[in-house]
Amino acid sequence: MAIALALKVFAGLLAAALAALLLEHYGLTGPSSSLPQPRNPQRPHPAPGPGDSNIFWGLQISDIHVSRFRDPSRAVDLEKFCSETIDIIQPALVLATGDLTDAKTKEQLGSRQQEVEWQTYQSILKKTRVMEKTKWLDIKGNHDAYNIPSLESVKNYYRKYSAVHRDGSFHYVHNTPFGNYSFISVDATQNPGPKRPFNFFGILDEKQMKELLLLAKESKESNHTIWFGHFTTSTILSPSPGIRSIMSSATAYLCGHLHTLGGLMPILHTRHFQGTLELEVGDWKDNRRYRIFAFDHDLFSFEDLIFGNWPVILITNPKSLLYSCDKHEPLERILHSTHIRVLAFSLSSITSVTIKIDGVNLGQAIHLSGPIFILKWNPRNYSNGTHNIEAIVQDSAGRSTSVHHIFSVQENIHLTFNPLASFILLTDHCMVVQKFARKLPRIQENPLLTRLLAYERRIQLRKSQMEEMPRQVMRVGCEFPCFPQTHATFPTPPCIHQPGKLSELLQLGFLWRFYYVGMIV
């Protein structure tokens, strides 16, 4: 029976993945004129050349998890990042995409907002004066919303200690002499904020979706729009037409949340059917990951990095074929460009930037200004098929790093993303977990799974964790058809009054864990 159940679970996951991909491809509601459409990129000029204009860069950091009880080096390294790394790279802006604090109890089983963690986070920002050096845009993650009964609660420390100081999604415009670039945040944290593990998924209701649609329309005249949030789109519950449709005019959606799935998926990148890139960045908490991104003549490039590794290199022209999209970018500019362009940063001065294409040494790039290095080239020499470009950078202290990627100046050539990464980022995991929950009585007929569920319940009840859940309102549903339209007030969680019956939320909390472990094995 257990084997049959396992096969059914696997078949259900496979069917859900195929259904999600088909729905992603064909959509549920068809084209909608009310949704912002991808802009027609200007082409083919200005093309990347010998000038130092038409370029800016930024950073993303996510899942910092400043902790009162664990790994003080997270905060120590964050302070170094805000001083040393920021001073060297000098980004135009930094996107801190959620889980700024850990918000766990000492034994790590429960959750609680720890004000000292927020004070530590804010003190780092103030001590390093990072908000004077760059635009620091920090947003909430699920950990930052644990145990918060309402946004007006004194426990909502995000309002008091963050750089942004306000809840909800927002639109930031980076103005340059060569155009405007929009950055739209997606706040899908739950309100009220339940305890762990019930806070894994994000939720957007109808009102929030309308607000995001307005922000998308505001950005339609910008050169590019980047959306950023904590949750992957696959872990956000949203009403029709869905969050991916709302952000379809964006070049990319930058997020965190999944922590490289415990190191099993260090690269979680994919592309929505509408062309928007979804780029999850690894966590700062355990892996000290961060990301550099740039717009060079409206061509978007990025590189995922490990803190403390120098030199940092980003090839901005020619850009990577895998992350190219003619719906959002003027890719013809690569063919009309006159120079290969590289950003290079290090603790010591850069002494050499060597460029190779298909293993052939093209020579040393020359320093233009700041971190920009250029090398004259003729892209028409590479007009057929795909090619590999490599940049090797060395500094005066002897540090050396190389990066490479596949590029093409030919149209209608595409590369595909890792299928497992696409499955993780494009499948509607909320729907899958909900279907598991609906079939839970059948699952409980299995003695092994019944014991596992009971064990999970004992863990959640340990040290009266459930009694600490916000008591004013516990939302067990949402305002759109993915869940029943149910809002209930519980003076004490129902599973405490009814020990023999698992609450729906407890079922979901267990099942998403079971589901994710089963998915990646």
Regions found by a protein language model. Give the residues of each.
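Acidic, histidine-bearing metal-coordination/catalytic regions of metal-dependent phosphoesterases
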Residues: M1-L93, K126-T128, E132-K135, W310-V521
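A short, flexible beta-alpha/helix-coil linker loop
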Residues: I64-S67, L100-A103, T189-G193, S234
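Acidic-and-aromatic substrate-binding clefts and catalytic sites of carbohydrate-active enzymes
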Residues: S67-A75, S111-R112, T233-L237
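Post-signal peptide N-terminal segment of secreted/secretory-pathway proteins
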Residues: T97, T105-K106
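Residue-level marker for buried hydrophobic side chains located in beta-strands
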Residues: G58-Q60, V94-A96, D138, W227, ...
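Short acidic, glycine-rich surface-loop motifs adjacent to enzyme active sites
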Residues: T97, A216-T235
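Extended active-site neighborhood of metal-dependent phosphoesterases/phosphodiesterases
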Residues: H25-P50, K106-N223, S238-A252, L258-L305
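Active-site glycine-centered loops adjacent to acidic/histidine catalytic or metal-binding residues
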Residues: D63, G98-D99, G141-N142, H230, ...
